[in-house]
Amino acid sequence: MDTIFAVSSGLLPSGVAVIRLSGSHVVHVVTTLCGCLPKARFMHYGNLTARDGSFLDSALTVFFPAPHSFTGEDCAEFHLHGGKAVVNRFLDELSTFKGCRIAEPGEFSRRAFMEGKLDLVQAEGLADLIEAETESQRRLAVMGTSGRLTTLYRDWRHKLMKIRAFIEAELDFSDEADIPNTVSDKVWKDVENLCISLREHIAEGERASILRDGFKIVIVGAPNSGKSSIMNRLAGKPVAIVTEEAGTTRDALEVRLVLGGLPVFLIDTAGFRETDNKIEQLGIEVAKQHVRDADLVILVYDMQNPKEVYLPETSAEIWRVGNKFDLYEENKEPWLIQFSALTGLNFDHFMKELESFCLRRVSEIGNLFPARKRQLQLLKEAVKEIENSVNYDSLDLSLRAEHLRRASDFLGKITGDIDVEDLLDIIFSEFCIGK
């Protein structure tokens, strides 16, 4: 297998650039460039010299012999000065060694998986950790890399395999006196309890999707109620056009924010009203769809001239807020909050309420749940097979056992214990080249 190398420290130029290598030629490459093989897992400082004798850089080198490395192969890292010319010259030198080439995206992690250093859940968690932009996403990724999910899924799979063993024993030795016909009957309660655990885990994963995908907060209201001013103040910059003319916003505008360490997608929509303008009508239909899909709807009213807006059916929480508080006296309308998006009067209170809403929703989520849609889908497939086995007790026992086998295979595919070769290219292509 080729020895692979890549920059693993990010964009250049930088203070330091880390070049990672993995494969059977690492010892030869390191010895040639350093003039010696450094002590394992100790930083070695010295000059790096090309094979033609030219100076490359003064650098730190660390050697990780197999199997005690990230990939399970011989690995090394060169910590160079992070100039583009320095790094490019060093990469060119590495490419001159026989059997050495630039790594493909995710190839280091893929080799770690193939060598049993990572399972698929941990690999996906690692990819999520690299991509994490908020504290909640970081915690979600750490859950995947910790191995706790893997332990849970393997435990469930082991239970299914043990149950199948009882059933198959009855099938294979039904005429033996020491194998009673009621053995398999005793396990179906265990199967039902396992199915309940899986369903609860799936429901937790669907609730927790907001940690990865973000909260969807939609701003709606009548034209000229100040929706775009609210959008701009929340975004901290002008992203929406604000004028006295009604109907300025024709399409939905989206801004990504972080509130309380949680990802939030804020959407400003076209004002709801009767209109003959075809473009504006389309904008209003788009707004209604966003309301249906929202986690929170902020229904904005002009406090001097509050116009009622009729929203489509939605499962989202709806906040009625009064805007333009700087122009009008506090009134008795049932506003949740009153503020001025233009001047910022009482807007801090509104921001704190938004943050509290997000944190409250997160507090309802448990500590262990599927972190990715792939995992969630395979869990649903496993539940479907278990339900087929439990609910159709008139089926031949061998068919019911087959449904349980398929369920355990779906659980095995989550961790990669069952052949998932067709998925590996998709999963590891999400990584950067140096990971």
From Swiss-Prot:
Cysteine pairs bridged by disulfides in the record: none
Cited PROSITE patterns: G_TRME
Domain TrmE-type G: 214-359
The entry's keywords: Cytoplasm, GTP-binding, Hydrolase, Magnesium, Metal-binding, Nucleotide-binding, Potassium, tRNA processing
InterPro entries linked: G_TrmE, GTP-bd, GTP-bd_TrmE_N, GTPase_MnmE, MnmE_dom2, MnmE_helical, P-loop_NTPase, Small_GTP-bd
Positions with a binding annotation for GTP: 224-229, 243-249, 268-271
Any one GO biological process: tRNA wobble uridine modification
Binding site for (6S)-5-formyl-5,6,7,8-tetrahydrofolate: R20, E77, K117, K435
GO molecular function: GTP binding; GTPase activity; metal ion binding
GO cellular component terms, A-Z: cytoplasm
UniProt xrefs under Pfam families: MMR_HSR1, MnmE_helical, TrmE_N
Enzyme Commission identifier(s): 3.6.-.-
Residues that bind Mg(2+): S228, T249
Keyword Hydrolase among UniProt keywords: yes
Names of required cofactors: K(+)
Compartment(s): Cytoplasm
Function noted in UniProt: Exhibits a very high intrinsic GTPase hydrolysis rate. Involved in the addition of a carboxymethylaminomethyl (cmnm) group at the wobble position (U34) of certain tRNAs, forming tRNA-cmnm(5)s(2)U34.
Subunit structure: Homodimer. Heterotetramer of two MnmE and two MnmG subunits.
The family this protein is said to belong to: Belongs to the TRAFAC class TrmE-Era-EngA-EngB-Septin-like GTPase superfamily. TrmE GTPase family.
The protein, known as: tRNA modification GTPase MnmE
Protein's organism: Bartonella henselae (strain ATCC 49882 / DSM 28221 / CCUG 30454 / Houston 1) (Rochalimaea henselae)
